[in-house]
Amino acid sequence: MKQPFCTPTQALRRVLDAAAALPVPATERVPLDDACGRIAARDLCARMDQPPFDRSPLDGYALHSADTAGAGEETPVTLPVVMKLYAGDAPAAALPAGCAARIMTGAPLPPGADCVLMQELTDSGEEQVRIYAQLQPNANVVFRGEDIAAGAPIAAAGTVLTPAHIGVLAGQGIPDAEVFRPLTVGVLATGSELLEAGKAWAPGKIYDANGIQNAARLRQLGFAVERTHCSDDPEEIAARMKDLLTRCDAVITSGGVSVGQKDYLPTVLEMLHAEPVFAGVAQKPGSPMIAAQVGEKLVFCLSGNPFAAAATLEQYAVPALLRAAGRREEDCIPVHTRGRLTTGFSKPSKGTRFLRARALGGLVEIPGEGNAEAHSSGSLSAMMGCNCLVELPAGSGPVAPGEEVEVLNFVQ
């Protein structure tokens, strides 16, 4: 499994390429009520013009604009009201010249009418109406297809469907959408020291936080998750991974990837005849991470240090899994922006370093008020409230408040 450490850019490219080469996920058709957050499996286009007819955007009177010539507060034009139209009505006849139609918001314009006058510029008459303003053709008309025309794209295949997509689809009379079935990810935490939350604590033991945190993040992104843990035994780890790979589309492990006497994951991957994608990334934290492929399934082996696991999950595992799940590549990658620090970081960075941070409105806060100890890869609590990583290039010195930095925003 040994390979030279790759750069973060190389590591991301390799896992995305590996994910894109996997078989396309199965699809299913779901009602729109259940489609939000799912990934469109094919291009979705408008079936009809929206709105499907010329309509009024306000309460007032539909008119022939020519009939309003010369109308003003001192020189009103009086017209007979020959019909009344509400939203949901279909005009029974065309509007004759020299007549008005009482019309409500959302109602279709009768044939012949070419403008709508708001009722505030009239006397609101029922049988006849006094017009106090002159209108141009097409005034206050929402035209057929103005929102979206028949055949126009709504969502490309690979798009995560949002409430706005759902609303537009429903407005087309489309009751459901073809989406990719969610991938199932096996999450395996390794370590003889681990206890499941709720068990009685014992000296030398710690509760498994990595496994459940990784699982929670994956569920947040729409994956189904099967979670378990096992002791530091290569045979047991291999058996658990084999079992997960029979039922899951990918596996993520935490712990056991470094060079300690009980870091067995490299050996286990060899036992499983895994093909390496990369083994090690030139960054801190998370440098020992391994990405591999067993058959047509991806395996990501993360550090057991909580922040290292969380950072590399976001940087490499999440983008690759989203790509494998059917998302468009551009929607799988953490978005890079620039931000100005409100707090600093007091330590130089010999190699590429990533810090947990919170970005809002172009400002970036690094937790711990510049205290490097708060950014230990073993610290879990400092992740709370963070929504991004700050990248400090190799050879960087300490950074101070007010400096501009590169920000990797977590994928949503």
Sequence positions of predicted segments:
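Short, glycine/charged-enriched hinge/interface segments at domain edges or termini
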Residues: 2-3, 8, 62-228, 373-374, ...
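Short beta-strand/loop turn elements enriched in aromatics
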Residues: 27-32, 53-79, 112-127, 327, ...
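Helix-rich terminal scaffold detector
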Residues: 1-9, 175-302, 306-312
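Residue-level signal for inorganic ion chemistry
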Residues: 15, 60, 151, 187, ...
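Flexible glycine/proline-rich
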Residues: 9, 28-33, 42, 88, ...
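Short, low-complexity N-terminal leaders and the immediately following helix N-cap/first helix
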Residues: 1-73, 327-354
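Short, hydrophobic/aliphatic alpha-helical segments
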Residues: 35-49, 90-102, 149, 291-292, ...
